[in-house]
Amino acid sequence: MKKLSILVPYYNEGEEVIRTLLDSIAIQQNIDFNDIEVIICKDGDEGPELTQEFLDSYPYEIQYHREPKGGVSRMRNKAFEYSQGEYVMWCDDDDQFYHCLALWLIFRETNTPMQVQINGVTQTVNGFDVLKSVFLEEGRNPETGETYFIDRKDGFQFVHGSVYKRKLIVDNDIHFFDDCYIHEDNVLFAEASACTTQIKWCPQPFYLWKWRDNSVCRRSPTYIKETYTDLIKSTDRLIEWFKAKSKFDKARECVVRIVYDCYYNVMCHPTWEEIGTKEYRKKAEKRFSDFYKKYKDLWLECPDQVKMQIGNGIRQMVVQMGMLQEKVTLDDFLNRMENLK
């Protein structure tokens, strides 16, 4: 068995784009390349193929699988099925590892101890079920084109810079949802964290979320507004997963989080009133209305203390952005959503 499987969905980006990721693996130091494998799943027939000559030029095992068109989530799931590593991580083909000791750092953390709560008792365990890290995000100033970098310390919704133990994934049927193509990766850590307390935090970044002009989530300044319905969709799938696992507390928390997010970030956010985004708001409210009607019972069942904690956290983030504009109460908003046709 390999120590680590690096799982990469590939669409039509070409060798010049994916080369940066594969090169960043090839320069890794203090590791045995026999301990790793890279699994690339090509999503459909569109775009250039990766040649065998190109793949063979790297000093580690690369598997290249051509799959019927299915979207990024299905490719990530298929790559996992092909993999054999004790640990796995998903990388985008246009990203890269940040430095030459990234994999050494990951391997080191698989053996170092940490204290966790198991059945209410503090115990010391070696390794981890999940490793989450700070990762770097590369950005561009829209006016000057200047490059800047952000430390993503709160990016738990992203799959970037995360490593998972295979046994955890398999034993708990943790997976991406095939029909989710946008905001699809926010479900994985939510599923995993509901199944284990052996989660380790790495404050040292080893992954770089690179800027690419053609990236689907970078090319539009109104991306979140355009895709808010997809965020609700992926959360809907996650709630059903929690319910199937009898993790009803987690399901309730998911409902509460979307209720407050939609209230503060859609209803109370002044930019959603702009002429260019009114249509997005209309679609978001209709999708949320359906969501709320479906899960109203879970909202009502959730303890007020939990609601307050989640709501205050989301409200504080909006306040810090200077975008809070509470024109209606939460109750009035929910009543309108319940009656929306």
For the regions a language model picked out, list residue spans one by one:
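Nucleotide-sugar donor-binding/catalytic module of glycosyltransferases
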Residues: 1-233, 341
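Solvent-exposed amphipathic alpha-helical surface segments
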Residues: 28, 32, 241-245, 298
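Compositionally biased, low-structure terminal segments
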Residues: 34, 55, 108, 243, ...
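Membrane-interface aromatic/basic loop that binds lipid-linked glycans or pyrophosphate carriers
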Residues: 64, 114, 125, 271-341
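Catalytic core of nucleotide-sugar-dependent glycosyltransferases
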Residues: 204-213, 218-249, 262-268, 274-295
